[in-house]
Amino acid sequence: MAEPVALTDSGIPEAIATAAERGHQVAVAYIDDDGYPSVSFRGTTQVIGPDRLAIWARTRDTGLAAAIAERPQVGLVYYGPGGPGPAYMALRGRAHADPSLDDAVYAAAPQGERDQDPDRNGVAVVIEIDRVQGFGQDGPFLQERTA
C-alpha cells in the first residue's frame, strides 16, 4: 500500500539539493508543442514542501514554462546511488509557473545554474507531486497523493 507523498522525509531534500553538484541532475519530461516528449536535466530542482518541487526555467515563453500552460503533466527521474536519501525516484505531477517564487527559487539554485541566466529571464516552475516510486535504504517505496 502506498504512503502519502512526503518529499521532506527519508533524505529526499538532501538528495535533490545536492544532485547537481554530484553529477546526478533530475531529468524532467513534458510534452512539447508538437506533441512529443521533451526530456532535459534540471540542476535547479528543489524541494519546497512535502508534495512540491520547484525548478528554474530559463525562459518564460518557450520550452517547459510555455508547454505546461496547456499540458501541465510532467514526469521526473532521479538516480543518485551513493548519495543521501533514495538511490532512485520516479515522480509524476502537475506543473505551473509561479512568478511569486522567482526570487526564492533563483536564489536557491546552484551558482553555475544562475550563471546560465544572469539576467533572470526565466521563471519559477512549481510541480505538485502526485506519485513517487523509488528505491531507498529500506528497499522499494511508493508514495501517492491522497484524495
Report the location of each language-model feature:
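Binding-site signature for planar aromatic cofactors or substrates
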Residues: 1-147
